[in-house]
């Protein structure tokens, strides 16, 4: 099916439901080196990204908050503004060294909850300079079933939300700087 672009508001009285083979996408960065897998809005946003890589590196696209063309402005369907693009990750293989990172300019805000099987849980908030979310399969989470949701919020800020990372042991923050 082709892409359809609307320049005005779209109203649905009963919601939109994404289903079918395009609703999920299996990802891994095997063989891609330290740069990892570069995610794009067209190929990865709005889908459940099933991570099948124990030591994957996934790089979020640079946030483009203002990309109006000189000719058409915000109604140009080729406008690359990506605010609101959401990336949902599902950990399908124990993450021993999985990293979700920004371009280094964009930073994380929001929170991530890490829970362990003894009922302990803790919310972690990224520091102002944090641009990496790492999971090691234990203290920073990454056990199979972990879910991470990240949305381009505004210029230079990705929001980490609706996130439950499963861990073990003495849990610690998954956020760091590059």
Task: Please describe what each predicted stretch is.
Residues 77-79, 140, 150:
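Generic marker of residues within folded, mature protein domains
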Residues 6-121, 157-178:
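Exposed extracellular interaction/assembly regions and N-terminal maturation sites
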Residues 1, 59-60, 135-139:
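Short aromatic-glycine motifs in intrinsically disordered, low-complexity regions
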Residues 151-156:
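Localized edge beta-strand/strand-to-loop motifs within extracellular or lumenal beta-rich domains
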Residues 124-146:
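Structured beta-strand segments within beta-sheet-rich domains
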Residues 1-8, 148:
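Parallel beta-helix/beta-solenoid repeats that form elongated, surface-exposed shafts/blades used
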């Amino acid at each position: 099916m082709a892409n359809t672009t609307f320049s005005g508001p779209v109203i649905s009285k009963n919601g939109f439901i994404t289903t079918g083979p395009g609703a999920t996408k299996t990802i891994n960065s095997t063989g891609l080196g330290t740069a990892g897998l570069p995610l794009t809005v067209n190929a990865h946003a709005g889908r459940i990204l099933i991570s099948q890589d124990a030591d994957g590196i996934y790089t979020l696209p640079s946030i483009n908050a203002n990309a109006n063309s000189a000719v058409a402005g915000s109604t140009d369907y080729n406008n690359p503004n990506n605010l609101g693009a959401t990336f949902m990750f599902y950990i399908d293989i124990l993450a021993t060294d999985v990293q979700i990172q920004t371009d280094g300019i964009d930073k994380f805000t929001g929170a991530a909850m890490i829970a362990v099987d003894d009922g302990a849980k803790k919310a972690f908030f990224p520091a102002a300079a944090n641009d990496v979310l790492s999971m090691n399969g234990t203290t920073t989470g990454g056990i199979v079933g972990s879910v991470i949701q990240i949305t381009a919020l505004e210029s230079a800020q990705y929001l980490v939300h609706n996130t439950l990372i499963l861990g073990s042991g003495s849990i610690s923050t998954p956020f760091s700087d590059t």
